[in-house]
């Protein structure tokens, strides 16, 4: 059975995992960097890259020990090659290249977004192509028709900020700390989601894309006014994001009747309110709803190893001179949408 070692270092998680072609996660480890970045209220790229340098090799050794295997037992090395913070991406990719060269194993350069896009198939063996994917994370917010490994059609993207970035900014504005997404979700549970009137950018419009910059600005003004309870403001913000995601996804579901399932992935997919709303939306379209377990939503090595396993099975490997890419769209044929191509 195929065994893939996956490495992930595109943002602020240093991770490695060993995954088999029949979906067994033999070992996985993730080292977060919350303590390093919390004083700054967000990820500092240079600090993140240096942390990856310090942590990746011990984590790789750890997963090999956990699984009771050596590099000789591995069939290929999969490493995130982009998109992401270029310093961190380079740490993981160079490590992957070195391991592949030293062990004489194939290298698989994985698009971080493809790692998220295929992660639901690691958790659910019944999920077949094609499926409609809402990919929602700190740096990306896209609707994609996933037609196969390496075959994606982008239906919508954000014209400005990603939903996850809006969560982090809101947490900072409200003094909730870092990481922002879980902090906002926790306090939102104590508030009234209808207490503060906030905009839902592009909701109801014919345009298929997302926008969160105006919502962020509205939260900033509401927070500065000092007239709103923090829990109410957090809950109202979260509900606005839910409404935006549901509205845009509704249009995509209507446009993709042949999609076999509606799938969500990415770090923001760990949010309970979002998962509940999307579950209800899928039911209205009579589609199965698939979401990875929470540990597979945030950045991890298992999703990179699984994407590597899927690509390896398709005969897709990469040369050792493959370059790291800070930007790498899953659908290179998709037209740029205002500022949307910056992060995708």
Curated annotation (Swiss-Prot):
Q: How is the cofactor bound?
A: Binds 1 Fe(2+) ion per subunit.
- Chief place of localization: cytoplasm
This entry carries the following GO cellular component terms, namely: cytoplasm
Which reaction does this chain catalyze?
A: L-threonylcarbamoyladenylate + adenosine(37) in tRNA = N(6)-L-threonylcarbamoyladenosine(37) in tRNA + AMP + H(+)
Keyword Iron in annotation: yes
Record: residues binding Fe cation:
112, 116, 299
Which HAMAP family does UniProt cross-reference here? Answer: TsaD
Name the family the entry cites.
Answer: Belongs to the KAE1 / TsaD family.
Q: This chain belongs to which protein, by name? A: tRNA N6-adenosine threonylcarbamoyltransferase
Q: What is the lineage of its organism?
A: Bacteria, Pseudomonadati, Pseudomonadota, Alphaproteobacteria, Sphingomonadales
Give the gene name.
tsaD
């Amino acid at each position: 059975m195929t065994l893939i070692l996956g490495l992930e270092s595109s943002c602020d998680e240093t991770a490695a995992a060993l995954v088999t072609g029949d979906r067994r996660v033999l070992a996985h480890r993730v080292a977060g960097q919350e303590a390093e970045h919390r004083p700054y209220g967000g990820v500092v790229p240079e600090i993140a890259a240096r942390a990856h340098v310090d942590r990746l090799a011990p984590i790789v050794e750890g997963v090999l020990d956990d699984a009771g295997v050596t590099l000789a037992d591995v069939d290929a090395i999969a490493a995130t090659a982009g998109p992401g913070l270029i310093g961190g991406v380079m740490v993981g990719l160079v490590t992957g290249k070195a391991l592949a060269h030293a062990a004489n194993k194939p290298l698989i350069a994985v698009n971080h977004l493809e790692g998220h896009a295929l992660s639901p198939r690691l958790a659910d063996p019944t999920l077949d192509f094609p499926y409609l994917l809402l990919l929602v994370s700190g740096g990306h917010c896209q609707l994609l028709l996933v037609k196969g490994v390496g075959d994606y059609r982008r239906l919508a993207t954000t014209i400005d900020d990603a939903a996850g970035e809006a969560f982090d900014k809101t947490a900072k504005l409200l003094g909730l700390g870092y990481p922002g997404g879980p902090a906002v979700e926790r306090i939102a549970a104590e508030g009234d989601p209808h207490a503060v009137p906030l905009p839902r950018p592009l909701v109801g419009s014919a345009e298929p894309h997302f926008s969160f910059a105006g919502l962020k600005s509205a939260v900033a003004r509401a927070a500065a006014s000092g007239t709103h309870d923090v829990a109410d403001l957090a809950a109202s913000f979260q509900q606005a994001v839910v409404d935006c995601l549901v509205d845009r996804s509704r249009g995509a579901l209507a446009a993709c009747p042949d999609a076999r399932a509606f799938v969500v992935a990415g770090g923001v997919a760990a949010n309970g309110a979002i998962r509940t709303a999307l579950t209800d939306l899928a039911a209205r379209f009579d589609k199965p709803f698939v979401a990875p377990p929470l540990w597979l939503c945030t950045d991890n090595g298992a999703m990179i190893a699984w994407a590597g396993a899927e690509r390896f099975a398709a005969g897709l490997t990469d040369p050792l001179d493959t370059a790291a890419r800070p930007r790498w769209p899953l659908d290179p044929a998709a037209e740029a949408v205002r500022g949307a191509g910056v992060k995708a």
